[in-house]
Curated annotation (Swiss-Prot):
<dbReference type="InterPro" id="IPR036621">
    <property type="entry name" value="Anticodon-bd_dom_sf"/>
</dbReference>
<dbReference type="Pfam" id="PF00587">
    <property type="entry name" value="tRNA-synt_2b"/>
</dbReference>
<keyword id="KW-0547">Nucleotide-binding</keyword>
<dbReference type="GO" id="GO:0005524">
    <property type="term" value="F:ATP binding"/>
</dbReference>
<dbReference type="Pfam" id="PF04073">
    <property type="entry name" value="tRNA_edit"/>
</dbReference>
<dbReference type="InterPro" id="IPR007214">
    <property type="entry name" value="YbaK/aa-tRNA-synth-assoc-dom"/>
</dbReference>
<dbReference type="GO" id="GO:0004827">
    <property type="term" value="F:proline-tRNA ligase activity"/>
</dbReference>
<dbReference type="InterPro" id="IPR002316">
    <property type="entry name" value="Pro-tRNA-ligase_IIa"/>
</dbReference>
<dbReference type="GO" id="GO:0002161">
    <property type="term" value="F:aminoacyl-tRNA deacylase activity"/>
</dbReference>
<dbReference type="InterPro" id="IPR002314">
    <property type="entry name" value="aa-tRNA-synt_IIb"/>
</dbReference>
<dbReference type="InterPro" id="IPR045864">
    <property type="entry name" value="aa-tRNA-synth_II/BPL/LPL"/>
</dbReference>
<dbReference type="InterPro" id="IPR033730">
    <property type="entry name" value="ProRS_core_prok"/>
</dbReference>
<dbReference type="Pfam" id="PF03129">
    <property type="entry name" value="HGTP_anticodon"/>
</dbReference>
<keyword id="KW-0030">Aminoacyl-tRNA synthetase</keyword>
<comment type="subunit">
    <text>Homodimer.</text>
</comment>
<keyword id="KW-0963">Cytoplasm</keyword>
<dbReference type="InterPro" id="IPR036754">
    <property type="entry name" value="YbaK/aa-tRNA-synt-asso_dom_sf"/>
</dbReference>
Length: 572
């Protein structure tokens, strides 16, 4: 490819609305352009990277025995109503009607469509197991699209769906997909971790996320410092303290705290250790409960884990925090003065709170707290559950080592769905015993566009992108200095361009009438791994300057050796 016949579209300045480095560099390197909120046009350089990610994904899915299909982006609403997700999915599901007033959705995922296909196409257990995948555009009407293609409304996704007649068969495919995903992300060159995860709105039993480690990540990923344990913070179990609860040393005292409406203010004004405070959060109770709200208690320096809390049988799903008006209607006090003593609604406390003594909490009276609260003496110990986020230094749930926490970008997710969708859509086959058998399902997703952004978050420097070799838009850049004035430079540039292309190497020849500084800056911004510079001065000694983008090292190589050298560097 020649730059004179290519849309390079690089930018010198960083766009003001680009928050994370991948968004900034994708705009500056001419990979994407914003069309509307959460919608991006992919330019030639971006498409080249995207296609390389797609190809790696496709190769490994095929190697794992999956079969490629293509399903419509537009899906009829009746399938979503049949599965129950029409009501469950919420406003991220973009709904519309056609000219015949028939309701449809823009697909954020394709469980319903593939299950509908299979229930009409398969009839016998002998046809199973099967695993289908597609690489296709999805749409989710994000409330706040941000970070460029990291959280956009329209994106490219590889989604796969497997069908089985037994849990053992599902486990085999699940393990094969786990291995395929590991190969995909390793081939791309990402530093990633596979972690246990919550199944979320997709549903099902077992689930793993594939997280690319990066400071800009939206997820907290938890690891043991000793074992292979890894989990999303939503799922990581907070182990109960091993030490028995300390004996009470204080009497419970009612204290005026008119200016302490938060834990931080309480700690600062009364010089309390934050570990001796408890915060109380009120959430909506499950429909049909005799109480409208449920009180959830965590230690003052801990955070409520909303995923764990939502799984409590007495808590409404989705988890909804009570408004001040709702709180006052039940407790007769505001949110800053809540606690377990005389709480008129059901209470669930975290395991760590259950082990506390002599602690401070709201008195359920505005502007007052109780200090020196002790369980069973001042208030009966309520239901105890794991409802907090783990913190760094907590013991690992597998009993080996302590926990570390890093930020991660989710690029892949695999689920064991079980029979959630097949039961709802009545997808079954004749089993080996001749009876009708509901199918067991798995689903497996990779955010292809997100992989591109995640790769940049791990691979950049002050000059631009430093692509992993496997997904770089071009493998070699040829920079001929003053080629329009030097016939020797022009002739050699054309010769090397032809020879490298003949070897199957992707080359970008910069034949623009530009200053050398602009040419160097653009190639480094785009992140092409191998650059060769042709100039009259070096050619006087039969030399070509070679530079490797990742480490910035330069060396002079003889003109007769440069093609062989590059082929060896790229192909091994």
């Amino acid at each position: 490819m020649r730059t004179s016949q290519y849309l390079l579209s690089t930018l010198k300045e960083t766009p003001a609305d680009a928050e994370v480095i991948s968004h900034q560099l994708m705009l500056r390197a001419g990979m994407i352009r914003k069309l509307a909120s959460g919608l991006y046009t992919w330019l030639p350089t971006g498409v080249r990277v995207l296609k390389k990610v797609e190809n790696i994904v496709r190769e490994e899915m095929n190697n794992a025995g999956a079969i490629e299909v293509s399903m419509p982006v537009v899906q009829p609403a009746d399938l979503w109503q049949e599965s129950g997700r029409w009501e469950q999915y919420g406003p991220e599901l973009l709904r519309f009607v056609d000219r015949g007033e028939r309701p449809f959705v823009l697909g954020p995922t394709h469980e319903e469509v593939i299950t509908d296909l299979i229930r009409n196409e398969l009839s016998s257990y002998k046809q199973l197991p099967l695993n289908f995948y597609q690489i296709q555009t999805k749409f989710r009407d994000e409330v706040r699209p941000r970070f460029g293609v990291m959280r956009s409304r329209e994106f490219l996704m590889k989604d796969a769906y497997s069908f089985h007649t037994s849990q053992e068969s599902l486990q085999e495919t699940y393990d094969a997909m786990y291995a395929a995903y590991s190969k995909i992300f390793s081939r791309i060159g990402l530093d990633f971790r596979a972690v246990q995860a919550d199944t979320g709105s997709i549903g099902g039993s077992a689930s793993h996320e594939f997280q690319v480690l990066a400071q800009s990540g939206e997820d907290d990923v938890v690891f043991s410092d000793t074992s292979d344990y890894a989990a999303n913070i939503e799922l990581a179990e907070a182990i109960a303290p091993k030490e028995p609860r300390a004996a009470a040393t204080q009497e419970m005292t009612l204290v005026d705290t008119p200016n302490a409406k938060t834990i931080a203010e309480l700690v600062e004004q009364f010089n309390l250790p934050i570990e001796k405070t408890v915060k109380t959060l009120l959430v909506k109770a499950v429909e049909g409960s005799s109480f409208p709200l449920v009180a959830l208690l965590v230690r003052g320096d801990h955070e409520l884990n909303e995923v764990k809390a939502e799984k409590l049988p007495q808590v409404a799903s989705p988890l909804t925090f009570a408004t001040e008006e709702e709180i006052r209607a039940v407790v007769k006090a505001g949110p800053g003065s809540l606690g377990p003593v005389n709480m008129p609604i059901p209470v669930v406390i975290d395991r760590t709170v259950a082990a506390m003594s002599d602690f401070a909490a709201g008195a359920n009276i505005d502007g007052k707290h109780y200090f020196g609260i002790n369980w069973d003496r001042d208030v009966a110990t309520p239901e105890v559950a794991d409802i907090r986020n783990v913190v760094a230094g907590d013991p690992s749930p597998d009993g080996q080592g302590t926990l570390l926490i890093k930020r991660g970008i989710e690029v892949g997710h695999i689920f064991q769905l079980g029979t959630k969708y097949s039961e709802a859509l009545k997808a079954s086959v004749q089993g080996e015993d001749g009876r009708n058998q509901i199918l067991t399902m798995g689903c497996y997703g990779i955010g292809v566009t997100r992989v591109v952004a995640a790769a940049i978050e791990q691979n950049y420097d002050e000059r631009g992108i430093v692509w992993p070799d496997a997904i770089a838009p071009f493998q070699v850049a040829i920079l001929p200095m003053n080629m329009h004035k030097s016939f020797r430079v022009q002739e050699l540039a054309e010769k090397l361009y032809s020879e490298l292309r003949a070897q199957g190497i992707e080359v970008l020849l910069d034949d623009r009438k530009e200053r050398p500084g602009v040419m160097f800056a653009d190639m480094e911004l785009i992140g092409i791994p191998h650059t060769i510079v042709l100039g009259d001065r070096n050619l006087d000694n039969d030399d070509i300057e070679y530079k490797y983008r990742r480490n910035g090292e330069k060396q002079l190589i003889k003109t007769g050796d440069i093609v062989e050298y590059l082929v060896k560097q790229i192909k091994g």
